[in-house]
Amino acid sequence: MSKKTIVSMAVIRRLPRYHRYLEELLKNDVKRISSRELSEKMGVTASQIRQDLNNFGGFGQQGYGYNVEELYNNLTKILGLDKTYNTIIIGAGNLGQAIANYTSFEKSGFNLKGIFDINPRLFGLKIRDVEVMDIETVEDFIARNKIDIGILCIPKDNAQYTADRLVRAGIKAIWNFSPIDLKVPDDVILENVHLSDSLFTVSYRLNEEELFKKLKGETAKIDG
């Protein structure tokens, strides 16, 4: 299980997209936009956008649309991006290092405080001035540095055990890149990220037309 949400996850997953697009509009000095214009750009119906935003009070004006800066600032607060969060990465392999090197997270308030691994040869390695440390010290580090989020980038064999350790140490949320769906207490936030899911979606779309041609042909044979 994971901590329950008040608003549906489908709505929550659309909010970062709205926020990202509004940020681009601000950079292009766009002052206002209608829900219809927003829907055309994002591939979501205008009705869906209004319904999503109404979960948080609604921000548009009849006949005017949305003030881009105001809506962006409101979504920043709704997403909790007006706050800062202390994070650690478990796993200093290629994926862990790639995430550690992604500076945009810090710009959004996610401050990387430590990186942990089981490989002694990696201890002391610095990635953007953040040192790789022994995983056996992680509980003490979490307590001393008030860590909010643990980012798991380790093989699935050790993922659940490591997640349990983080939870016992007081971690509030886990962003899991290990290829396994973890189980955590109801009061812990868990986001499982399976990178292969997106790639498999791409492969499906590449083959979709051919797939349905075959299915249509097989159906025609049966009917004949």
Curated annotation (Swiss-Prot):
Transmembrane segments: none annotated. One of its GO terms (molecular function) is DNA-binding transcription factor activity. Keywords: Cytoplasm, DNA-binding, NAD, Repressor, Transcription, Transcription regulation. One of its GO terms (biological process) is negative regulation of DNA-templated transcription. It holds the Pfam family Put_DNA-bind_N. GO terms for cellular component: cytoplasm. NAD(+) binds at residues 91-96. Residues 17-56 bind DNA. Gene3D superfamilies: NAD(P)-binding Rossmann-like Domain (3.40.50.720), Winged helix-like DNA-binding domain superfamily/Winged helix DNA-binding domain (1.10.10.10). SUPFAM superfamilies: NAD(P)-binding Rossmann-fold domains, Winged helix' DNA-binding domain. It is found in: Cytoplasm. Belongs to the transcriptional regulatory Rex family. Modulates transcription in response to changes in cellular NADH/NAD(+) redox state. Homodimer. PANTHER family: REDOX-SENSING TRANSCRIPTIONAL REPRESSOR REX (PTHR35786), REDOX-SENSING TRANSCRIPTIONAL REPRESSOR REX 1 (PTHR35786:SF1). This is Redox-sensing transcriptional repressor Rex.
